[in-house]
Structures are given as C-alpha cells and as structure tokens.
From Swiss-Prot:
Signal peptide: none annotated. Belongs to the peptidase S54 family. P-beta is proteolytically processed (beta-cleavage) in a PARL-dependent manner. The lineage of its organism: Eukaryota, Metazoa, Chordata, Craniata, Vertebrata. This is Presenilin-associated rhomboid-like protein, mitochondrial. Residues 1-50 form a transit peptide. Disruption phenotype: Mice develop normally until 4 weeks of age. They show subsequent progressive growth retardation, atrophy of muscle, spleen, and thymus as well as severe apoptosis of T and B lymphocytes leading to premature death between 8-12 weeks of age. Mouse embryonic fibroblasts lacking Parl show high susceptibility to intrinsic apoptotic signals. This defect can be complemented by Parl or a soluble form of Opa1. GO terms for cellular component: mitochondrial inner membrane; mitochondrion; nucleus. It is a multi-pass membrane protein. The modification Phosphoserine is found at residues 63, 68.
C-alpha cells in the first residue's frame, strides 16, 4: 500500500499501477497514458506488450533533385514531383539491359519501316502524278470560290518545303502532349510514361514518348523553333523517310545515354523534351555543311560557322555532364550530338545504303502475295 500511495502521489499514474494482493504486478493497461519525467518525455504503454518501439516506416527513394520545392523553383522545365516515388534497383546495371535491347530493336524497326515507306512512296508517285493532272483539269472547269478557308490552307501547305511539311506533324504531336500536361487528372500517367528515368518502373516506352513531351511552353517553343529552322536542310540531306527514322532513333538513343549517365553517377531524376533528337539534327547538318553560317535569333548581327557552333555545344554539354549541372540533361544532348555526327559520317553508308535486301523482300511480298480464288490448276 505504501508503494501504491507513492506511485499515485509522485508519478500521478492512478490505480492502474497498483500491485495486486496476490503478489507480482498485473499487466499494464493502455486505458490511460501515464506521463513520465515531466512534459517532454511521454511514454504511451501498449496493452500486453510492455514498452515496444514503434516500427519504422520504410519509404521508397525519391528523385535525387533536392527538395521538391527547390527543384521546381530551380527549373520550370520539369513537372512537379511532390507525390512521385521512384524505385532505383539495388543492381543498377541490370536496369540498363532492357533499355539497351529496346534501343537496338526500335532503331532497326525505325529504319526498316522507313525503307518500306520510301518504296511505297516511289511506287505511288506515278499514280499521284496522274491524279494531280486530273485535279488541275477539274479545278480549271469548276468555279473558283474566293476566300475559301480550305483553299487558303492548301495554298499555305503547298508553299512549305518538304522538310517543313515533315516536321509539322512532329510539332503537332508535341503540342498535343503539351496540352495533356495541363490536365490535372493525367499528371501521374504523364510522369510515368512521358518522362524518362532509370529509377522508374516503366523504362522502355518513355524513351520514345518523352521525346514528344514538354512541360514548359518556353522549352517546347525553343525546341520546335530549332527543329523548324533546320528541317529543310536535314530533309534535303537525308530525305523525308530517312529523316523520320533518324529523328525517332535519336530520341531513343539519347535517352539511353542519359540512362547510362544517371546509373553511373547515381543522380536519378526525370527527363523530358525533344532536345536530344534535335541535337542529332543540328549535329548532322553542321557536320555535313560545316562552313554554313548560323546566328542567334535575338542577336542576328553575330554570325558563326556551323562547325564552330557544334564544337561549342559539345564542349558545353560535356562540361555540364562532368560537373553535374541539373538544369538540362546534358548527357542526352551529348548522346544526340554524337549520334548525329556518327550517322552522317558512317551510319548513312552502313545502314541506309544496305537496305536493298529488305526492300527486295518487301517487293516479293507485294508482288507475289497470296492469289485470290485459290484452287488447283
């Protein structure tokens, strides 16, 4: 009884701490929360468990971009990632296996499809020529409608070069994805499939989809302006079909180089934008026409050669990759530029000029396809 009175007066715990008459102590009750050692040290007793340490919650690793607010203030080019969780593998090298084979397979399919596309285009040009003659004859006998919106659109479309017509579809796709970023209910889906990150659960498809993804209007406008400016030159060099294959392959290859750099340095984070593919276009044109003159849009007075511009860009991206600058994905830029230089120097001879076996196989399929009617002769 003396012990019970001392506990009640000194610890202020009530009768729950009193010993039973039969000796020993009964189990502690959690109906009251005893206070020990003043206000700063509160221990809550669990029933039938004594003093048990609360289990520690293990949280998955988040993107290595500092705090969410700091990352968003530092760069407006990436989407907000407050609720995004990434899962880096305990064996980082293994995460590169699937992207590596995806890069090889997609590049092969892109160039194979471009070769078949070119074959079909050449085959349909004769028919298109006669269709054009017929259309001109019909236009000559039909009464012309002044101020027709469709006529004005056709006139504008016909005034574009082949390169500008080709990149118009690419620009439209980028604009569509940019609009999807503005839909709040699609944020998680967009971050998962339209940003590339080796710590994400989805590795392969974002390597292509992120090439058409921009979160910032300024980022998209700058990339599309550069693409539009170099579109005529690159299509004149490669042709429409080969350019599309190079552009899509460059987006995947530049993202794979970015994956390798992020895994090697341990600096995981999402990337998006067409900069890697556009760097391939820029590097290809500058390598093919190194004496060409370029200028900055806001400083047209200062001009420089394309060769010097390419050297400066490669030097800046190399420094950014080594020093760990986070505003741009310098590894993707550098990978795209090196791919553009390699393709103009060697890739065109190794890949595009060896497409004839595939074209012959496709020609045989188109010519000797399954005959209608069947039956024996």
């Amino acid at each position: 009884m003396a012990l019970q009175g001392w506990v009640q007066r000194g610890w202020r715990c009530g009768p729950a701490w009193a010993p039973p008459l039969g000796g020993g102590y009964r189990e502690l009750s959690a109906t009251q929360a005893p206070r020990l050692l003043g206000r700063r040290f509160n221990l809550f007793v669990q029933q039938k468990c004594g003093f048990r340490k609360a289990p520690r919650k293990v949280e998955p690793r988040r993107s290595d971009t500092g705090s969410s607010g700091e990352a968003y203030k530092r760069s407006a080019l990436i989407p907000p990632l407050e609720e995004t969780v990434f899962y880096p593998s305990p064996y980082p090298i293994r995460t590169l296996v699937k992207p590596f084979f995806f890069t090889i397979g997609f590049t092969g399919c892109a160039f194979g499809s471009a070769a078949i596309w070119q074959y079909e285009s050449l085959k349909s040009r004769v028919q298109s020529y006669f269709d054009g003659i017929k259309a001109d004859w019909l236009d000559s006998i039909r009464p012309q409608k002044e101020g027709n919106l469709r006529k004005e659109i056709n006139k504008w479309w016909n005034s574009l070069s082949d390169g500008q017509r080709t990149v118009t579809g690419i620009i439209a796709a980028n604009a569509l994805v940019f609009c999807l970023w503005r839909v709040p209910s699609l944020q998680r889906t967009m971050i998962r499939y339209f940003t590339s990150n080796p710590a994400s659960k989805v590795l392969c498809s974002p390597m292509l989809l992120s090439t058409f993804s921009h979160f910032s209007l300024f980022h998209m406008a700058a990339n599309m302006y550069v693409l539009w400016s170099f579109s005529s030159s690159i299509v004149n060099i490669l042709g429409q079909e080969q350019f599309v294959a190079v552009y899509l392959s460059a987006g995947v290859i530049s993202n794979f180089v970015s994956y390798v750099c992020k895994v090697a340095t341990g600096r995981y984070g999402p990337s998006l934008g067409a900069s890697g593919a556009i760097m391939t276009v820029l590097a290809a044109v500058c390598t093919k026409i190194p004496e060409g003159r370029l200028a900055i849009i806001f400083l047209p007075v200062f001009t420089f050669t394309a060769g010097n511009a390419l050297k400066a860009i490669i030097a800046m991206d190399t420094a950014g990759m080594i020093l760990g600058w986070k505003f741009f994905d310098h590894a993707a830029h550098l990978g795209g530029a090196l791919f553009g230089i390699w393709y103009i120097t060697y890739g065109h001879e190794l890949i595009w000029k060896n497409r004839e076996p595939l074209v012959k196989i496709w020609h045989e399929i188109r010519t000797n396809g399954p005959k209608k009617g069947g039956g024996s002769k």
